[in-house]
From Swiss-Prot:
Its main location: membrane. HAMAP family: Undec_diphosphatase. Belongs to the UppP family. The keyword 4Fe-4S does not apply. This is Undecaprenyl-diphosphatase. It catalyses: di-trans,octa-cis-undecaprenyl diphosphate + H2O = di-trans,octa-cis-undecaprenyl phosphate + phosphate + H(+). One of its GO terms (molecular function) is undecaprenyl-diphosphatase activity.
Length: 273
């Protein structure tokens, strides 16, 4: 593979990762399809995917840095307010409660979960995750009990964490599981989305560091330019995607995302079967 070709592949996959990581459409499903079509598979490809996820995580940190520091008691002047945010009553305990279920299951069944990374499992997860999005829109309370992040209860945070366990199924979508769970628990669509992004930082960081540690032997000096391009591309695209997504969900439901998931599932079937 030539240097220019590998850098082009890195940029393409960085765009795919950045666009899909925080949308309820399954970044895993997209990365499997695009990686297969580009002929970029194997141990190096898996390590590459782990590295560029860090770029997506950094985008969330940049977007929500004030809120993230506020969770640990560090405040920088007067907080900037956005719709869905308020005065700092969301605490680190909410985040920890949202993490516990998936962390426990993820650590206990890490190797088993990794063995599920294949097209057939991803295809089914795309469909089931789409059905959950539709269920969340249809069954959510007419008036949310938590319209903003700071209205959320500990119980709601923990239940969202339980829904997050569904994302251990490759292709399900972590954001899809947590946002759907939040809506079913009476959290507004906007607040559930923001909580999902905040929850992503420790969850994805922990999972990525663990995967990177286990994949370190596949990383060589020659891969650094390619990995750097993918990382930066994923960061920039994820930043744009998050901002756009938070504006979009003020106007539309998640039904279009569910339909899109079904289309991607069909694409997985066509490409691999």
């Amino acid at each position: 593979m030539s240097d220019m070709h590998s850098l082009l592949i890195a940029a393409i996959l960085g765009v795919v990762e950045g666009l899909t990581e925080f949308l309820p459409v399954s970044s895993t499903g997209h990365m499997i399809i695009v990686g297969h079509l580009l002929g970029f598979e194997g141990d190096t490809a898996k390590t590459f995917e782990v590295v560029i996820q860090l770029g997506s995580i950094l985008a969330v940190v940049v977007m929500f840095w004030r809120r993230l520091f506020g969770l640990i008691g560090i405040h920088f002047g007067r907080p900037l307010q956005r719709e869905g945010e308020s005065k700092g009553r969301l605490t680190l305990i909410h985040i920890l409660l949202g993490m516990i279920p998936a962390v426990v299951l993820g650590l206990v069944f890490h190797d088993t979960i990794k063995s599920l990374f294949n097209p057939i499992n991803v295809m089914y997860a795309l469909v089931v995750g789409g059905l959950l999005l539709i269920a969340a829109e249809c069954l959510k309370p007419k008036e949310p009990r938590a319209s903003g992040l700071d209205d959320m209860t500990y119980r709601q945070a923990f239940m969202i964490g339980c829904f997050q366990c569904l994302a251990l199924w490759p292709g399900f979508s972590r954001s899809g599981a947590t946002i759907s769970g939040g809506m079913l628990m009476g959290v507004s669509r906007y607040a559930a989305s923001e909580f999902s992004f905040l929850l992503a930082v420790p969850m994805m960081m922990g999972a990525t560091v663990l995967d990177l540690y286990k994949s370190w032997s596949f990383l060589t000096a020659a891969d650094i330019p390619m990995f750097a391009v993918g990382f930066v591309t994923a960061f920039v695209v994820a930043l744009i995607a998050i901002k756009t997504f938070l504006q979009l969900i003020k106007r539309i439901s998640f039904i279009p995302f569910a339909i899109y998931r079904f289309v991607v599932a069909a694409a997985v079937y066509v490409v691999f079967f």
